[in-house]
Regions:
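Carbohydrate transferase catalytic cores enriched for Leloir-type hexosyltransferases
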Residues: 1-380
C-alpha cells in the first residue's frame, strides 16, 4: 500500500507549533512495513515527493536554533532546492497512491482541491486536531476572502473516510460540532512527548510558575495574570509568573493586559525563545500552568519530561492523561479560585510532593502515535 501525505501547508507556513511537532514525528517515526509513504510538497513546476526520512529532516527545521533575522521560509526553500526531491506533475499524482492523508490544518485552496480530487478516487484520511474555529471563534481572525476555504476544510473533516483524532475531546467535538457520521471511521491517537530527554526536577529559590503558548483568549492568560497579581498584592505571595510565547494576533487588548502586568513587576513575558531556551526555562520553573481549552497539549508532556510538575484546569486532554503521574487538576472554579491555588502551590512541601508524583516514562510515545495513524490509513 502506498499513501501520499500532503504537507504543502508546512512549506508555506513553517513556524514551530504543536501541529508541526506532530508532522515532524509522524515522519521520523513512520514505520517500515507494508504502508509506504511519500510526503508531498510544492516545488517549481509541480510537486515533490519526499521519503519519511527526508520529510523528517525538513520538518525539523523550525525547531533548530537560528538567528532572529533568518526567515524560516527561506531556510525551507533552500533545503528543498538542495534536496532536489523527485518531481511529478499534479495530474500524475492520482496514479501513484492507494490512499491520501492530510495531516495538518490547512485552508489553502490548492490543498483542499487536491484532497477533494483524491476523495473521489481513493480512501482519504485526516488527522483531526480540534473544531476550535467553530467552538472558540473569538480566537481566530481569518484573512478576508478565506472563510469559504475554512468551511471547506471542516467539511472535509466531517466527510473524510477516516479521521485520527489527537484526543477523546477532539473526537467528541468533531462528532457533535461538525456532525460527522459516527458510522464513519474515527479513532484516537495521542501525540507523544518522548522527544524530550528526561531531566531531574529542580526547585528555584523563589517559586516560579510558567505558562507556555501564544496569548489566546481560550488559554486565559489575562485571567492567570490577574489572579497572580491578586495573590501578590492582597496576600503577599513571594513568587514569579513567567509567560513564554507569541502575542495574540486576534486581540490586542490581551497583549496590552500582559504588558501592563509585566510593568507592575513579578511577571515576565519572553517572546521568540528557541526550543532549547524554552526547555531550560520550563525545567527551571517550580510548576507548569496549563489552563483553559487545549485540543491536546504537547507542552504538558514536555514539562513532565523536563522535571516540572503540571497544574491544570479546563479542557486539557494531555494533562488528564497524566493525572497522578505529574499533573494535578486545580479545580479552582475559574479565576476567583486561582489566587488561592498560587498561594498553596508556592509552598515548598506541596511542590516537592507534586514533583514526586512525576512519571516521565508514562508519557505517550511518538512511535505509538505513528503506528495508530498507519493503522487508520491501512483500514480506511
Amino acid at each position: 500500500m502506498h499513501v501520499g501525505i500532503d504537507i504543502e501547508q508546512f512549506v508555506w507556513d513553517p513556524y514551530a507549533s504543536g501541529i508541526q511537532r506532530v508532522l515532524q514525528y509522524l515522519a521520523l517515526e513512520w514505520p517500515a512495513g507494508d504502508v509506504q509513504a511519500d510526503f508531498v510538497i510544492p516545488v517549481r513546476g509541480g510537486l515533490g515527493l519526499l521519503t519519511p526520512q527526508q520529510a523528517g529532516e525538513l520538518l525539523t527545521l523550525p525547531f533548530l536554533p537560528r538567528e532572529p533575522d533568518v526567515d524560516l521560509r527561506d531556510a525551507v526553500n533552500a533545503w528543498i532546492a538542495e534536496a532536489a526531491p523527485l518531481r511529478v506533475k499534479d495530474g500524475d499524482l492520482l496514479a501513484l497512491y492507494d490512499a491520501w492523508l492530510l495531516p495538518e490544518v490547512s485552508y489553502l485552496p490548492s490543498v483542499l482541491r487536491r484532497f477533494e480530487l483524491f476523495s473521489r478516487c481513493v480512501p482519504t484520511v485526516m488527522i483531526g486536531y480540534d473544531a476550535l474555529p467553530m467552538t472558540e471563534p473569538a480566537n481566530y481572525r481569518f484573512k478576508p476572502g478565506s472563510n469559504a476555504w475554512v468551511s471547506e476544510y471542516f467539511r472535509h473533516l466531517a466527510n473524510a473516510d477516516s479521521v485520527v483524532c489527537i484526543s477523546d475531546w477532539t473526537r467528541d467535538s468533531i462528532l457533535t460540532r461538525l456532525r460527522r457520521d459516527p458510522a464513519k471511521a474515527i479513532s484516537v491517537a495521542h501525540p507523544g512527548g518522548d522527544h524530550i530527554p528526561i531531566r531531574e526536577a529542580v526547585q528555584p529559590e523563589r517559586p516560579v510558575f510558567v505558562r507556555l503558548g501564544t496569548m489566546e483568549a481560550r488559554k486565559q492568560p489575562v485571567e492567570i495574570a490577574r489572579a497572580f497579581r491578586t495573590a501578590v498584592d492582597d496576600h503577599g505571595l513571594d513568587a514569579e509568573l513567567l509567560f513564554i510565547g507569541g502575542h495574540s494576533a486576534s486581540d490586542e487588548s490581551i497583549n496590552e493586559a500582559i504588558r501592563d502586568q509585566v510593568a507592575h513587576g513579578r511577571v515576565r513575558w519572553i517572546q521568540g525563545a528557541s526550543d532549547a531556551e524554552v526547555h531550560d526555562l520550563v525545567h527551571q520553573a517550580s510548576a507548569f500552568l496549563s489552563i483553559g481549552v487545549e485540543g491536546y497539549g504537547i507542552p504538558v508532556l514536555e514539562a513532565i519530561r523536563l522535571g516540572t510538575p503540571v497544574l491544570f484546569d479546563g479542557v486539557q486532554p494531555a494533562a488528564e492523561l497524566m493525572v497522578g503521574r505529574g499533573a494535578r487538576r486545580l479545580n479552582s472554579e475559574g479565576e476567583k479560585g486561582l489566587p488561592g491555588a498560587f498561594r498553596h502551590w508556592s509552598d515548598p512541601e506541596a511542590l516537592t510532593q507534586l514533583s514526586l508524583e512525576r512519571d516521565p516514562q508514562a508519557v505517550p510515545t511518538w512511535r505509538g502515535f505513528a503506528h495508530e495513524v498507519v493503522m487508520a490509513v491501512r483500514d480506511a
